[in-house]
Amino acid sequence: MTLVSSELVEGINQLLQVLTTALQQLRVHRAKTRVWGYNRLHDQLTAHAVKLADFQDALIARLLVMDAHVDLQNVGRLRIGQTVEDILASERGLALESVQLCQRLHETSRIDVFTRVLIEKLALSEDERLQSYDQSLELIRQLGTPQFLSTRC
């Protein structure tokens, strides 16, 4: 059994909750964009969901290696967008929450190197998504939704 701090286990489980919420929200958003015919956006959301699922699997594995409790019982509130702009904004919110949790976990004093590297990779990936959402939302503001959709989705 690995000696691990309860703060770290709690933090990883909080991160798992955010990822579980994000995956469920992405499931609905992917379906909506597919039905609406926005294939490029659908493909982007699908690629993001695959990455998140891989990170979720890796975090679960880390907890199991630590002989710690894996808590997947709680899913946060889903913020299902009714428009493409709403979808991007709600996905941005969860990406930001993930980045903030990763930063807090990274500062945990008793964190092993494998978990630290995993959290750094997740933070980097989510930060890239955050920048992508910010860029898309800014383009919507500048171009308007119809023009954005015709050129980007």
Descriptions of predicted regions:
Residues 1-153:
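Iron-associated oxidoreductase/ferritin-like identity signal
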